[in-house]
Design a protein with these regions (language model features):
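Conserved, mostly hydrophobic/aromatic
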Residues: 7, 40, 76, 136, ...
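Active-site-adjacent beta->alpha loops and helix N-cap segments on the catalytic face
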Residues: 13-19, 39-49, 64-74, 89-105, ...
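Glycine-rich phosphate-binding active-site loops on the catalytic face of alpha/beta enzymes
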Residues: 7, 82-94, 132-145, 189-195
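Conserved N-terminal beta1-alpha1 strand-loop-helix module at the mouth
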Residues: 1-71, 112, 120-130
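Short secondary-structure boundary segments
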Residues: 58, 88, 116, 137, ...
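Catalytic-face loop-and-helix region of soluble metabolic enzyme cores
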Residues: 137-140, 167-170, 174-177
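Catalytic cores of alpha/beta
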Residues: 117-129, 176-194
Length: 195
C-alpha cells in the first residue's frame, strides 16, 4: 500500500487533485500496487470515481448531529471514503480517541491507518488491530531524510512490535521518503508500504 497524504498543499488544490488521482489509478493498474490518496476533506468527492483508495486525513470521535465543524465517520463514509488516517503527527489525538476511532471505523468496515511516532506507540497500538500502523519519527517528517536510511532500525523494530500483537495489522513507514530507493529500502526492512 502506498499512501499519498496530500496535506493542504496548493499543488493538489482544485482540479489538480483529479490529475493526481488519474495518474495514481494508471500506476496502480500498471504495477498492480494499491495506491491510496488522502486529500483535504473538501476534495474527497472529486476523486472517489477513480480506482484508487480514498482516505480521510482525519476523523473525529464525535456523535452524529450537533457537531459543527467535526468530521464524523458515519457521515464522511457516505462520501465513499475507504478509511482514514488516525493520529497523524500533524494532528495528534488522545489515546482514548484513538481507541474509539479504531473500533468505530472497524464497525463501519473502513481501513484504519494509525500513525505512531516511536516503537513504544507501535507496540501499544498494534494490539488494537488497526489495518495499518505507520511509523513516522517526527524529526524526519518533511526533511527529505528518509527513515529507511536515517533510522532503519526503527522499521525493523516496528515490524517486530506489530508481529508481537499476532493479528492482521501491517506496518507502513513514512517520514522523509522521497525516492524509489527509499521505498525499496523500507520494503526490504519489512515495511508493507509507504505513507
Amino acid at each position: 500500500m502506498f499512501i499519498i497524504n496530500c496535506k493542504n498543499y496548493d499543488e493538489i488544490s482544485g482540479d489538480k487533485i483529479v490529475k493526481l488521482a488519474k495518474i495514481s489509478q494508471k500506476i496502480s493498474k500498471k504495477y498492480k500496487i494499491p495506491i491510496a490518496i488522502a486529500p483535504p476533506h473538501h476534495l474527497i468527492p472529486l476523486i472517489t470515481k477513480f480506482n484508487v483508495i480514498v482516505l480521510a486525513q482525519h476523523l473525529d470521535d464525535k456523535k452524529i448531529g450537533s457537531t459543527t465543524g467535526f468530521m464524523i465517520p458515519e457521515i464522511v463514509k457516505k462520501s465513499k471514503i475507504n478509511g482514514s488516517l488516525i493520529n497523524h503527527s500533524e494532528h495528534r489525538i488522545p489515546e482514548k480517541e484513538i481507541k474509539n476511532l479504531i473500533k468505530r471505523l472497524k464497525r463501519l468496515k473502513l481501513k484504519t491507518v494509525l500513525c505512531v511516532k516511536n516503537i513504544n506507540e507501535s507496540k501499544k497500538y498494534a494490539k488494537l488491530n488497526p489495518t495499518f500502523i505507520a511509523i513516522e519519527p517526527p524529526e524526519l517528517i518533511g526533511t527529505g531524510r528518509a527513515i529507511s536510511t536515517e533510522k532503519p532500525h526503527l522499521i525493523t523494530k516496528a515490524v517486530d512490535s506489530v508481529k508481537l500483537a499476532k493479528n492482521s495489522t501491517k506496518l507502513l513507514c513514512g517520514a522523509g521518503i522521497v525516492s524509489g530507493k527509499d521505498v525499496t529500502r523500507a520494503k526490504k526492512l519489512g515495511s508493507k508500504g509507504i505513507l
